[in-house]
Amino acid sequence: MQAFTAHTGLAVAIDSANVDTDQIIPKQFLSKVTRDGFGVHLFHDWRYLDDAGDKPNPDFELNQPRYKGASILLAQENFGCGSSREHAPWALADFGFRVIIAPTFADIFYGNSINNGLLPVKLTSVQVQQLMDEVAAKEGAQITVDLQALTVTSPSGSVFDFTIVESARHKLLNGLDAIGLTLSFEQQISDYETHIPAWFA
């Protein structure tokens, strides 16, 4: 998993609350079990005017030229609600997003994002709206998210503090998924196993 320390990138806003995982990645695209290849189906029902995905919807933000290459997504309350499918953060990451900023997230989506190297940042509704307004006002507007300093810097230079559980921060800073985190304690595990009584082995 790629480590995350700080990221500056083009931002795009989806100004809707309660965006659920079926909107993020519809169920008909969940047959794969590997993490790659889901980006093309991200927000499928909004991005395309047809079921085959051949006719892009020109009104949807991700299809607009000014947001091409966006790596920071701004959203409203309760982002990632609905079913617990891990494919949702897979699709967002495969599309190129590194950070999702919203006032609140669904708990399971929040955890799945961290486990897959995608940073979910909680800011107040007022702060998120300011970011959305600034991004809409200036083409090419970029936001900086610093996980070491726990700050978000808006296009105009406003700085917002955010919090994240230290264990999650540690995993992201060091690029550790659940398996990688376990392996980081390999020596301690080995030491423990050499000292436990044989009948526990």
Curated annotation (Swiss-Prot):
The keyword Transport does not apply. Pathway: Amino-acid biosynthesis; L-leucine biosynthesis; L-leucine from 3-methyl-2-oxobutanoate: step 2/4. GO terms for cellular component: 3-isopropylmalate dehydratase complex. CDD domains: IPMI_Swivel (cd01577). InterPro entries: 3-IsopropMal_deHydase_ssu, Aconitase/3IPM_dehydase_swvl, AconitaseA/IPMdHydase_ssu_swvl, IPMI_Swivel, LeuD. The keyword Amino-acid biosynthesis applies. It catalyses: (2R,3S)-3-isopropylmalate = (2S)-2-isopropylmalate. The lineage of its organism: Bacteria, Pseudomonadati, Pseudomonadota, Gammaproteobacteria, Alteromonadales. Keywords: Amino-acid biosynthesis, Branched-chain amino acid biosynthesis, Leucine biosynthesis, Lyase. Its EC number is 4.2.1.33. This is 3-isopropylmalate dehydratase small subunit. Heterodimer of LeuC and LeuD. Catalyzes the isomerization between 2-isopropylmalate and 3-isopropylmalate, via the formation of 2-isopropylmaleate. Belongs to the LeuD family. LeuD type 1 subfamily. Coiled coil: none annotated. GO terms for biological process: L-leucine biosynthetic process. PANTHER family: 3-ISOPROPYLMALATE DEHYDRATASE SMALL SUBUNIT, 3-ISOPROPYLMALATE DEHYDRATASE SMALL SUBUNIT 2-RELATED-RELATED. Pfam families: Aconitase_C. GO terms for molecular function: 3-isopropylmalate dehydratase activity. Signal peptide: none annotated. NCBIfam families: leuD (TIGR00171), PRK01641.1 (NF002458). It comes from Shewanella frigidimarina (strain NCIMB 400).
